[in-house]
């Protein structure tokens, strides 16, 4: 009977996490920049409900209303998965302010303000809650040619620890997952680069 809010669940990891939560018995609130048609189909096929909300999370003003809508629909929320993210690739010497801001606004700024809004609901509900943030192995390794992505995912690790420290007294668990390279839309350009793809595969 739990309700999980999952951002960026149209494809890839986010879609997989939404389906996994649905298989575990959760109803899903999906927040995406496009309608996640295939995810909705698969979640509802499992007998779970799916509330689809469309938003550009780089604009944080609308975040409280999104979670208010989720609570209005289901009566409560229990889990937040902050998965929505993007990546821009360019040498650090040539990296633009727009590519910096777009990535930072979605990958770290929205993570904090989504978590803040969810935590307020968790506290008001009195039952605690779970927040799962998606970091990256680049939070630790740095990587190359993705300066704003690396900065944002390093920030995700930092604020995850901070929120866990502050909100433990409210029975809110805050954790981060740091995946390696996965076959998703975000890594399509990387996998298409034969040299970089070979370098990564050689590590296995």
Where do the language-model regions lie?
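Active-site loop-to-helix junction immediately N-terminal to the catalytic Tyr of the SDR YXXXK motif
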Residues: 90, 95, 141-150, 162, ...
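Conserved glycine-rich Rossmann-like NAD(P)H-binding loop of the short-chain dehydrogenase/reductase
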Residues: 24-38
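Residue(s) in the substrate-gating loop at a strand-loop-helix junction
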Residues: 136
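Alpha-helical segment proximal to the catalytic Tyr-Lys
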Residues: 120, 165-169
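Conserved glycine-rich cofactor-binding loop
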Residues: 3, 10-12
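Substrate-binding pocket helix/loop in short-chain dehydrogenase/reductase
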Residues: 91-92, 96-104, 196, 200
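Active-site helix of classical SDR
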Residues: 115, 152, 160
């Amino acid at each position: 009977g739990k309700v999980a809010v999952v951002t960026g669940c149209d494809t890839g990891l986010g879609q997989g996490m939404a389906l996994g939560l649905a298989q575990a018995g959760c109803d899903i609130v999906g927040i995406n920049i496009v309608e996640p048609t295939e995810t909705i189909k698969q979640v509802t096929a499992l007998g779970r409900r799916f509330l689809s909300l469309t938003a550009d999370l780089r604009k944080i003003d609308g975040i409280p209303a999104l979670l208010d809508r989720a609570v209005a629909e289901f009566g409560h929320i229990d889990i937040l998965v902050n998965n929505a993210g993007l990546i821009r690739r360019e040498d650090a010497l040539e990296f633009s302010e727009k590519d910096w801001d777009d990535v930072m606004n979605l990958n770290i700024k929205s993570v904090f303000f989504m978590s803040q809004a969810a935590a307020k609901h968790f506290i008001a509900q009195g039952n605690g809650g779970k927040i799962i943030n998606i970091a990256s192995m680049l939070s630790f390794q740095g990587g190359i040619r993705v300066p704003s992505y690396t900065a944002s995912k390093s920030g995700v690790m930092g604020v995850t620890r901070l929120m866990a420290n502050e909100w433990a007294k409210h029975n809110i668990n805050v954790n981060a997952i740091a995946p390696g390279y996965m076959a998703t839309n975000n890594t399509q350009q990387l996998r298409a680069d034969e040299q970089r793809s070979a370098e990564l595969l050689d590590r296995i």
